[in-house]
């Protein structure tokens, strides 16, 4: 195996998140679906945006959030995704560069604007996302840089990349290159709406290409069309090397061959916003995995990094995750 430059390269939608606090009536009056990611066109996104008072406007996107978390932990990372060379696209490029992440994908100079996600957070801290993908949809296999794939230990792909045939082709090219260079492919299901729309394609991708799977309990059950959690775990077991399944306040379950590892969740006094919790769990887990930690410790790190993002608005960490994880692991009697 050749030497690597990056611990992880992630591939996903490059978006800017607009975060706003709303009441449940805001959603019900507009017949907006709570708790999921809903794709909208530019006009609808603009209409929702006009009706809220934004708390923050920050770079986002699931896979981009994950590498931002990894970079905060001290990992070497790259990102592949598409923006337009407009104001929001330049904001995204500045933010990801400031985080220490290599981002070489050429921006669009014409066509759709940079994608944005209006993230509405209700008093129960649940996030409802209304996403205009815009330029993000224009990712093609030409954007998949063979050298970056070759130079990365793990290729991390988000489940939101399904709505355009060209995006799917890009995913397959990345997976095939990963196998060519004996790299591992990690995949996050991302959202139950993605599962319900693309179940068969997802299962095919997982079966043929994925080594490491991330999902939450509801997503894994939806993937196998069952209400039985244990049945879903049995379904995924022969398909991947590692499955990391989160269960909110009940922690996470790691499935590896015949082994099941149960890890408790971090205790959080006040959950402010659930946006990005799954993204940051994946960041912590992958950091542990690329740095030789046991699967149990990987899950513990994932729990720590997910917990940090639950305590504030936005999906990017607000403290040094490296220092936080070191402190927490020492407190738990684990090697920092």
Predicted regions, residues:
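Conserved phosphate-binding/catalytic loop of the ribokinase/pfkB sugar-kinase fold
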Residues: 104-108, 119-164
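A glycine-rich helix N-cap at a beta->alpha junction
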Residues: 95-112
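Hydrophobic beta-strand scaffold residues
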Residues: 77, 103, 185-186, 243
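Glycine-rich phosphate/adenosyl-contacting loop at the front of the ribokinase-like
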Residues: 1-80, 90-91, 98
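Alpha-helix C-terminal capping segments
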Residues: 67-76, 120-122, 288-291
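Conserved beta-alpha-beta core of the PfkB/ribokinase-like small-molecule kinase fold
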Residues: 154-234, 250-252
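Conserved phosphate-binding/catalytic region of the ribokinase-like
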Residues: 1-9, 14-15, 28-36, 176-177, ...
């Amino acid at each position: 195996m050749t030497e690597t430059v990056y611990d992880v390269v992630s591939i996903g939608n490059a978006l800017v998140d607009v975060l706003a606090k709303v009441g449940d009536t805001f959603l019900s009056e507009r017949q907006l679906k709570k708790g999921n990611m809903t794709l909208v066109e530019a006009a609808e996104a603009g209409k929702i945006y006009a009706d809220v008072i934004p708390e923050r406007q920050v770079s986002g996107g699931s896979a981009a959030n994950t590498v931002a978390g990894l970079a905060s932990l001290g990992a070497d990372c790259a990102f592949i995704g598409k923006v337009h060379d407009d104001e929001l696209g330049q904001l995204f490029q500045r933010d990801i560069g400031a985080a220490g992440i290599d981002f070489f994908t050429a921006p669009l100079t014409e066509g759709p604007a940079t994608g944005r996600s209006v993230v509405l957070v209700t008093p129960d801290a649940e996030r409802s996302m209304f996403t205009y993908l815009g330029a993000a949809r224009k990712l093609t296999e030409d954007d998949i840089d063979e050298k970056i794939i070759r130079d990365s230990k793990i290729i991390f792909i988000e489940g939101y990349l399904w709505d355009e045939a060209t995006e799917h082709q890009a995913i397959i090219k990345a997976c095939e290159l990963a196998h060519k260079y004996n790299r591992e492919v990690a995949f996050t299901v991302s959202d139950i709406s993605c599962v319900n729309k693309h179940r068969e394609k997802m299962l095919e991708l997982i079966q043929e290409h994925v080594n490491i799977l991330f999902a939450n309990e509801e997503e894994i059950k939806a993937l196998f069309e069952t209400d039985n959690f244990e049945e879903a775990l049995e379904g995924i077991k022969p398909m991947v090397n590692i499955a990391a399944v989160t269960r909110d306040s009940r922690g996470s379950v790691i499935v590896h061959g015949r082994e099941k590892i149960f890890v408790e969740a971090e205790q959080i006094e006040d959950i402010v916003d659930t946006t990005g919790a799954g993204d940051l769990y994946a960041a912590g887990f992958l950091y542990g995995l690329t740095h030789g930690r046991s699967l149990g410790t990987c899950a513990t790190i994932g729990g720590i990094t997910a917990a940090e993002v639950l305590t504030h608005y936005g999906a990017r960490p607000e403290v040094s995750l490296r220092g936080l994880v070191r402190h927490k692991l020492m407190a738990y009697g684990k090697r920092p």
